[in-house]
């Protein structure tokens, strides 16, 4: 059984971020960002996270799953103030769910991460209300409810 968590790194210092990962005994961090090197926090860059997790968070493993990130086009649309999706987040959620069903390899999530007890989904948003990791978590629970339980937002 996978305990699934969510975390965003913005508004957290490196000390806070890695402290949370360590305190919650996270075995594997799954990065679900489209651009894992384009963020403001240097500690969250793709090439640095595996080292920091290994050294500062009890050997936590790192895996980038770009197929679970919203596409560039979908992100552009939700950020464009003139698009309906930017005003109604449910439209984004529906489009992202469709993307996960048709263009991702979501079906192998349990197979790939089932060897870990505590897994966290990472993206940049500080909370998950308007973040794709919440939608992804919900979908994983719907698809794999016997193999995954939601542990919470970190």
What does each of the following model-derived ranges do?
Residues 1-154:
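Residues lining hydrophobic/aromatic ligand-binding pockets adjacent to catalytic sites
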């Amino acid at each position: 059984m996978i305990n699934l968590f969510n975390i965003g790194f913005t508004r957290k210092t490196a000390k806070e971020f890695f402290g949370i990962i360590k305190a919650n005994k996270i075995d594997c961090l799954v990065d679900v960002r489209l651009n894992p090197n384009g963020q403001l926090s240097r500690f969250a860059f793709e090439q640095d996270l595996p080292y920091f997790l290994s050294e500062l968070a009890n050997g936590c493993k790192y895996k980038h799953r770009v197929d679970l990130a919203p596409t560039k086009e979908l992100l552009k649309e939700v950020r464009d103030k003139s698009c309906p999706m930017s005003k109604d987040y449910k439209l984004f959620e529906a489009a992202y769910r469709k993307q996960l069903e048709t263009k991702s390899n979501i079906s192998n999530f349990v197979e790939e991460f089932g060897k870990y007890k505590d897994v966290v989904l990472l993206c940049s948003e500080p909370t998950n209300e308007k973040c794709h990791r919440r939608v992804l978590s919900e979908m994983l629970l719907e698809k794999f409810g016997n193999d995954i339980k939601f542990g919470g937002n970190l």
